[in-house]
């Protein structure tokens, strides 16, 4: 009897029919695919996208050249050179970040004592020429200046979790 049952299951392609049943069940349900360039899903305010350097309200850059972000970066993507100013404080003379090395872990953002380096919600960017993947201090400050309102709003909304 067992041999007959196994023969019928094999002959009728029982496993194939079970698979087709699952396919038929889901065939008429609502699709979950998002047509990406035309439709976009909401992005969390904790999203870790392109980096930016922030400034204080008076226009002075926040980075104090403590180099904590450079030390904590597991991918060694950040390089900082600093100079001392006349008043005895340090500031960065160059701040470079290689986005091909960066793994967007967020350690640089967490380690920064003055909230200078942040990761923005920007996820759509590309490079057309060699070397554009190296984000300089000027590029990072420009991104920070452009998106400061959004960065500040995201930080305010997320302050209880920091």
From Swiss-Prot:
Compartments where located: Cell inner membrane
Binding positions for [4Fe-4S] cluster 2 per the UniProt entry: 73, 102, 105, 108
A cellular component term, taken from the record's GO annotations: plasma membrane
InterPro entries cross-referenced by the UniProt entry: 4Fe4S_Fe-S-bd, 4Fe4S_Fe_S_CS, NADH_quinone_OxRdtase_chainI
Enzyme class: translocase
Job of this protein: NDH-1 shuttles electrons from NADH, via FMN and iron-sulfur (Fe-S) centers, to quinones in the respiratory chain. The immediate electron acceptor for the enzyme in this species is believed to be ubiquinone. Couples the redox reaction to proton translocation (for every two electrons transferred, four hydrogen ions are translocated across the cytoplasmic membrane), and thus conserves the redox energy in a proton gradient.
The name this protein goes by in its record: NADH-quinone oxidoreductase subunit I
Organism: Francisella tularensis subsp. holarctica (strain LVS)
Name of the gene encoding the protein in the UniProt record: nuoI
């Amino acid at each position: 009897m067992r041999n007959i049952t196994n023969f019928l299951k094999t002959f009728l392609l029982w496993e194939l029919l079970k698979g087709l049943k699952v396919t038929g069940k889901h065939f008429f349900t609502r699709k979950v695919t998002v047509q990406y360039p035309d439709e976009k899903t909401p992005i969390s305010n904790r999203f870790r996208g392109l980096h930016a350097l922030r400034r204080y309200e008076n226009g002075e850059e926040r980075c104090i050249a403590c180099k904590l972000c450079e030390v904590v970066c597991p991918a060694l993507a950040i390089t900082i050179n600093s100079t001392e100013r006349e008043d005895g404080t340090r500031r960065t003379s160059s701040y470079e970040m290689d986005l091909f090395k960066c793994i967007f872990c967020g350690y640089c953002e967490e380690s920064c004592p003055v909230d200078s380096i942040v990761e923005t919600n920007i996820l759509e960017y590309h490079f057309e020429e060699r070397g554009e993947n190296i984000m300089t201090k000027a590029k990072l400050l420009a991104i920070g200046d452009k998106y400061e309102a959004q960065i500040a709003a995201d930080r305010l909304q997320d302050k209880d979790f920091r």
